[in-house]
Amino acid sequence: HDDAVGQQLPDDEVLGRAVAVEETAAVNAEYLPIFIKRGIAAELLDEKLAQFDLARLAAELDAGRDYQFGYLGLQTLYDRYFLHIKERRIELPQAFFMRVAMGLALNEIDREARAIEFYQVLSSFDFMSSTPTLFNSGTCRSQLSSCYLTTVPDDLDGIYEAIKENALLAKYAGGLGNDWTSVRAMGARIKGTNGKS
């Protein structure tokens, strides 16, 4: 039998992998509802996730897709993306993808069907959402945007308000772009102080 890199695998390793996938599938199916309830109780997940048919979604989890990851990919998910309580990760890879998919499907008419569709493309790596979506989808802070563009007004209050807004937006992993064209040039007259900028 050949694996992904074309090396010969002994039959017992192939069988062992098949058993591992089957065992992982059972764990995933049992784990998803527990994970959702625990995440809601810890105020990490949106309470609306409990309204999904969790058994139906759990049945769609494909444990074999965990084997698509290389070490670095899985470690990156663990270090940066998986939800945690006091540094203890509470997400498994397939639960992570389903949580993101559920968050994206919250307002859909047939949310379970849409969540399954989103899960299929995410977990198969056919499409990968941006970092803010992976961080925040399905959570209590469902900010999914990757980038914010703002215009900074030409007055002191407006400039400091723009800085405050940037800090609040950056908190949830969105990129920032500011249009400063309305701010007067260096050396221009400041009416309120009769000075120069």
Predicted regions and their residues:
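Extended catalytic cores of very large enzyme megasubunits
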Residues: 1-197
